[in-house]
Amino acid sequence: MRIEKEIKNLLTTRNFSSEKNQTQFLRIQNWFSTHRLNSRQKNKNSEIKISTFFACLPLALGFSCFLFKKNDIFLEGQGKASKASSFFQTNLPVFKTYHPKLTFETFEYIVKPTALETQTEGSPMIFTPSKKKDFFEKKKNKNDVVLNQNSFFGQPTFVGTIKKSPKPQQDVLQLVEETLFNKSEGISSFLLAENKETVLEQATKKFSGFSCDSYTISSKKLSLVSSSASKLSKSLSASFLKAFMLDEFPSYLQGLNPKSSSFSSDKGVLITKSPALKVFSKKKYKVEVKSSKVKGQKSESDKHLTFFLESTKLLKKLTLVNSKPSPLILFKKEAKNDISNKIVLSPAQKDFSYQTRFSSKQPSEKAKAVSVVVKSVKDSNLLDQKTYKNDFLKEKLPLKNKSWKPFLLSKKLSIKTCVENTYYKNQKEFSIDAIQLQAEFQKVFIEKKISYPFLEEAKALNPQIKTFELFNIKNPFLKQCWSIFFQNEMKNRDRNGISGDFTQSILDQEKVQNNELFLDDTSEKILQNLEKVQVWNDSNGVRAMSGYIYPDTNTRDLEWFLNLQKTFTRERVEPFFFQEKRPFKVNSGIKKATAFFPSLKKERKNSQLLGVEKTNLSPLEILSKVSFPSRTTNYSFSVKPFPQIFIKTRESFLTHPETKKIIYDGPSVILDSKKNFDWSTKHQTNLQLWFQKYVSPLNPLVQFQGNFFCEESVEKISQIFSSDREKKREKSEITAFLPLKLGKNAKCEIDWFYDSELVESFFAPSISSLQIPSEKEQPDAFLNQENIRGMYLTLSEPEDPNKVEVFFPLLELKQPSFTNSIKQSKRFCHKTSFFENGYSSFFEFGVKGNPDFDFSGVFNDQKQFAKKTASGNYRKTLSFFSKNQEKTSLFVQNWEPLNATSWLAVSQLSFAIFSFRVLKSLSDNYGRELLGYLMDLVAALGVLDDSLKQQIQILTGERQTGFRVFLESRKKFTDIVGIQKVLLELYEIVLFLRNSGRNFTHSETLPHGILLTGPPGTGKTLLVQALAGEAQVPVIVLSGSSLMEPGESAAFKLQLVFQEARQLAPCIVFIDEIDTLSSKRSQLLQNPMANDPGFESFLESFLLQSKPSQSVKKTESFFGKFKNGAKKEFDNFKKQKKNPAEYNSKQNEKQVSLLSQLLIELDGIQGRNGVVIFGATNRPEVLDPALLRPGRFDKIVKVGLPAQKKRVEILQFYGQTLGYQKTMPWAYFGERTVGFTAADLATLMNESALKAILNQSNHTIETLEHGIERLTTSESEKYTVLKKEKEFKNKTTTPLLNSSRIYSLRLAYYQAGKLLLSYALETHPKTMRASLWPRRPTLRSLAITANLEKSLFEFARLWELTERIIGCYAGKAAEFLFLCKFSSTGLSEISTLGLEDQVFAQKLVYFMLENCHFYSKKNAIQQAMKMSPNSNLKELRKKPEKLDLYSELLNTIQFPPMWEASERETSSLTLQKNKEHSGIGFEDQIRYSSPWWQEDVSAEMEFKPKNPGKGSRLYLYDYERTSRNPEWVPPDEFYHNSSGLKDIKNAFVTLSDQKLYSVEKATQNKRKELGKVLAAGFSKKENEGTKNIKKSSAPKASFTKNNVFCEWNEVSKLTRDYPAHSLLLQSFNKALVILNQNREILDRIVVELLYQEILKKPQIDDLMKELENSKPKTEPNVFSTELQFDASKKAPFVELSWGFQSRKPIPRWIDFAAVKGETT
């Protein structure tokens, strides 16, 4: 830091005058230089750690989020709007802001009316409807209180009167009697007290508001109405209402059945209802109870426990009634007499429901009103007096009206079907899998049971106890309490006393004191233990975070729960948790709980319950006799409100878009379908997500700040805007589910009372869209009120003849994201937009009064709607739980509850993991490219070397390493066939690799390098794989071509290969095509001494240093005299076309460096213990000798072509999978596949398998033949021979004259001639298959032929080769015999048929003459005595690159580029000249410019004077031969294009003509003598086959002395060609004679071939045997292959004559008689 400050001061002052400053400046410079060097060195040595960047990324993003959030809070505090948003708040759904939406799914759940709130303190208030029209009149009674609920966003405004509840001292039974059966007083009243009716009436004509519970009601029979849109026929589409059966829907408490709400108005009473659950007993009761002074109060944190008791068990009891979809229904006004198509949504058969009423706002209230209803009916039909069988109630509660029926169950929803309407017949059904939904709901709900965990302890003490198996405690706290109690209690009890029923022994100890019902001893013990072990409320959050099973269970909850059972337990009554569990729902006035009523299974003598025997009594009858306790323990608690949405109605109207006629004018429900749920297609995932987000108890909208922190530290201040006034509220007043809202320290006594009328919630169906598309041609098709989407609700008794149905349309608006402050508009209209494709809307929609939504940018309300907030300043995802408030106060504590989507617990970690995964994928996919760009940039700056860059690219994977690693090979020796001989040499390698970890003496003697040689496809690679599989070692595979890539270091890649091999040792390194890596090096010094690794390594490194080429320097000096433009032109030409010699030299340098690296790795300083090198090549002759010496490749294994037996084994091995026929001629296919490699045989069997699968058979002869043909040949065109055509009918024409038939016969005779001669010649290979239509050979066939020829001619005799040449001309000779009769027709012309055989015969003849020298010994001498045509090689021997340069320049001069253009132009002019009809004139001759170098040379040498150089002032030793002398001219370099050899005819010009004449005459005399000898030696009898052959005497050609030029090097070719022509002619004549002698056999083979088209060897053998047997026995041999001679005088010939006119006119023989001295 001190040095940095000094630097700053110096840079600011810039004063270096003083010595001190100068010294300080130098010191700073030194510090900078050393720091720069150290940092560079550190950066070079340090590795790139991308993980560090990834680890710091979440921290940086989180810090940025913190800064953005602080900025937003600061700007909001100053009243400014902040546009900045953090990364998390923008991208994560946890922090997204959503406006409250009212979707049509809201109406698909069970709703209940909005509870009212009182503004008075005192006794409980009862809310009842009234029929008074003028509600705003003054209060008539003193006890009446005006109730006015605050109006805020989404909540309707209700105004009504309430009355205090009756006095608690009133007789309970009398009140029940007056309430239940006072029919004359009016059924619409809720409570009759003191003969005064308390009413509440709607103040306006608006539709009453609804509030949807966060959970829907479970029901056995629940008909929902959903909406769907689909296309109809005739391009009609509409949204429709459909009823479908759904078995299960969740709720806060299973079994909850809120009743319908009744509101009286001018038009009638609105009554709707929803069914209940089947949860009660078999008895049929309808009892309403009222109690007083119930003081039990429950803690707030027990709500989850009571909500979910036995929820799963109730779900399991519910079954699907009807899985078929219900018929389509439309909510309409029900006709009076139309009952046939009426569908009634009736409740379940056995139901139980309750309803709570509360109205509380101030936390200091002490008295509340609670209503409890318990009812049970058999079915939807009303119960009459006959079905009412409760004798006890009949006595105590006499009926005042015998025709009385419980009207509470008669509220029905009238629905009329639309079966007769064809509009709905073809609609797409909206179906849902109710069974699957039921399974989903069962997984969502949490089962919480409270029972005793005494099973294990009780069984240990008394094995006879069996009733304990029904119970289990899941709460750890209760389990601990019970365990302590049970152990202490069992020690004190006598075990003999509990040998019977343990339950009965507990019941005997129950006591009743002071008319209060106490628990048994077990419960009392538990309460005592609870006092000792306290579970405080403030530990709930910690327990939830710690993962407790029941974090919401504390001491107060358990005490309340146990004390609650006092109301249901009496003396001699078994505790409910020891009996059969039957769910019973009760409302205690404190909090709704789930309890289990006792089931009195056993009758006991002398047991009474308040004087009434219990044997025939149900639990309700027991409760009716019980006098509830007047005093209980008081527990202070507060109930938090539950989230709830408020749906508001408005006066709206629908008008026709064209006529402007009002179709409907009245109340309606406004919806918004921007955010909806796809229940039909994604009900599984959507339902789970919906529950987790909106319904889960861990949702912040349900779990409030007080529950999270266990206390409310800071009071929230919210501001709610109303249309008339502004009020501040303590909290957002969301309707609570429970009837109490008390303060934490509040204590009160609860009055229980009866209520005859209950407000039921109703089921409100809806649709999703306001616009109904229709065609413009029929706009009035549905313009009536019946087709307006909405709902009809019956508001009176079903049997009431004056019932009224009110229709409420469902209208949809879309809420925009903008709001404007514009003056309020009393009335405005919002028109819907037209549909595309010719559709328009039916209605125009408008709203009267103040709208709830801003659906227009022009007309807007001044009201600023509240924003839905949750979890502090953040807003959660979309929900229909509306906290309709806007936080305007600062200093509000931000908190985040612990839930599944919490940022503190999960979001940050998940986002970090997500970011890490994304960045990891980016680094995997694009990291190499980015790193490559970075390295290119660094290399361009000069910091990174090119070689180092290449190494980094290989290490990072940007470039390929050139090898692959196979850690495991599945091939074994059993998977390879025909390698028995090779296995003996490879087993020792397997032994070495398997025992590489052991030390044995002979390990070093085993070969560490093996070279596999052989033709391609013989299985070298497969052999290495099998070896690796047997040795169980990895294999590193590389090829020479993969290392030799341009711009890369092959030596470095090879070094990486062996480094990897040493790490994987023991392993195998397999180098395929090793000849590309180790070709022979030229001009190398061979070491005649013993192997010296040090000297060889030094020699190899010395050879790597190649001298730089001087061609560039000489080229510059050569062109130094020319102009700059010419030089540039030549440079561009040199760039476009590189010098081949220079390029080859560079390639040679790379090749030598790669070979040297390979030699060093094979036998260098570094060892390769456990690494075995395998090399494979098919050209071992090109390998460098240094590679093949011992120590590198110790053993050379030749993998040749498989023999016949091995070929058969390979065919059988690959055919065993599919199978083959039993009579398969394997010997035939073994001979048929001569020359095939193992890979060829495998491919053959694969093709055969495909053919066999198509034929649905095994391998057959046909499939194998098909495989051979597909491998070796391709398709060819076929011609017909015997096809009947019109030419046969014409007698004048001959069928054989047809060209196609002649061609077919040509083919037949050609194939027959080859077949016959192969059997006639002794050493010629026999024909295996003859086809009439020969197929074109493929490249693979040529390779097979090459392999066969190479193996065949390794050792061959002269006679064998001669017969092969004769066999090559057999087909052509047979073709000539066939066409000899058609010489006059012109069809006997020579064809190209059999060109391949002729070419092979010519190559074979050249092989015999040039390589084998069978016929001419002079040819070998002449080839060795060749002379050099010029002295180019001698003069430029040290500069081979100039030879290529001069040859290229010479070609350019002789054939310049303009010459080709001139030729093209000349040819085009010639073509134009030949066109006689063309009227275009001839163009003038185009003049081409001379070459640039020619102009420069002529200007320099001829037309300009020479400019002699100036003399040198320096003394030169030899100025003539010194390059510094300006007058010195270097010697010329000559390149000769012509040959310097002379014509051999001019070599003997010095000889006289007389000598030539004498030599010629002597030769003629010698020929005459030899002719006489031959005439005497041959028989006078001519052969029958040669009679028809006419001798033709051609005129002698006259040659001049100067018409042919022949140099000495051409003499060897003449010497070769002369006997070659004679040998080919003699072979053809031999084939022609043999076929002519066996003409009958040839014709028979042709007939068979034309008939069968394909002849195989078995058929050919049978045909030959048949022809042999058909010959006369006088003839000794079927085939005549020898010319007949006169046996009178025999001469032992050694060499026959080539002909009288040939260079070998006489034969050579040995005269044994002359040798022996005998006379002839």
Curated annotation (Swiss-Prot):
It holds the Pfam family AAA. GO terms for cellular component: chloroplast thylakoid membrane. It is a single-pass membrane protein. PROSITE patterns: AAA. One of its GO terms (molecular function) is metalloendopeptidase activity. It comes from the Eukaryota. SUPFAM superfamilies: FtsH protease domain-like, P-loop containing nucleoside triphosphate hydrolases. It is found in: Plastid, Chloroplast thylakoid membrane. Its main location: plastid. Keywords: Chloroplast, Membrane, Plastid, Thylakoid, Transmembrane, Transmembrane helix. One of its GO terms (biological process) is proteolysis. InterPro entries: AAA+_ATPase, ATPase_AAA_core, ATPase_AAA_CS, P-loop_NTPase, Peptidase_M41-like. The chain crosses the membrane at residues 48-68. The keyword Cell division does not apply. Lacks the zinc protease domain of other FtsH proteins. Also much longer in both the N- and C-termini. Belongs to the AAA ATPase family. This is ATP-dependent zinc metalloprotease FtsH homolog. It comes from Chlorella vulgaris. The lineage of its organism: Eukaryota, Viridiplantae, Chlorophyta, core chlorophytes, Trebouxiophyceae. The gene is ftsH.
